[in-house]
Regions:
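Compact, glycine-rich, soluble single-domain proteins
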Residues: 28-146
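Bacterial N-terminal signal peptides
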Residues: 11-22
Length: 146
């Protein structure tokens, strides 16, 4: 199963990813890293148990360099924006908040499409590792509290 085609379920959530044409990204960085506008874009749909659907425009981080950069130095993230980290094949993943300026929620998605873990409101700049706990193919980062 490819990460882009995964359907993610975890009690209250159903998440589907669909590839979109690259879109311009308004969030900038204050570092020599490539701007987020250089990242490919995808649309992420999150559906609650009560069938409420939330759509996010997500930057795709699917290389070692883009996964290492993530949302570093991004000063704001609108509620409808996200970043997805793609891992193929599925693997144990550890995320941290180094050089991340905003709080984030993280969804860890296994290769069966299930959200295996949710970590809410990761603290900006925190160097503690947030572990997936199981092999995952995606990590979805959303604005903290989303």
């Amino acid at each position: 199963m490819t990460a882009a085609g995964a359907v993610m379920r975890a009690g209250a959530l159903l998440v589907a990813a669909a590839l979109l044409a690259p879109l311009a990204a308004p969030a900038g960085t204050t570092s020599p890293l490539p701007p987020l506008s250089a990242f490919p874009r995808e649309r992420i749909a999150v559906e609650t148990r009560s069938a409420r659907r939330h759509v996010f425009e997500a930057w795709r981080a699917d290389t070692p360099d883009t996964r290492a950069q993530g949302l570093m130095f991004v000063k704001s993230l609108r509620p409808e924006q996200a970043m997805i980290f793609v891992y193929e094949p599925a693997q144990h993943v550890g995320m941290w908040m180094k050089n991340t300026l905003i709080p984030l929620d993280m969804l860890f998605v296994d290769d069966g499409g299930c959200v295996a873990k949710v970590h809410e409101r990761a603290r900006p700049g925190d160097l503690c590792t947030v572990e997936s706990g199981v092999p995952v193919v995606l990590v979805v980062e959303l604005a903290g509290g989303t």
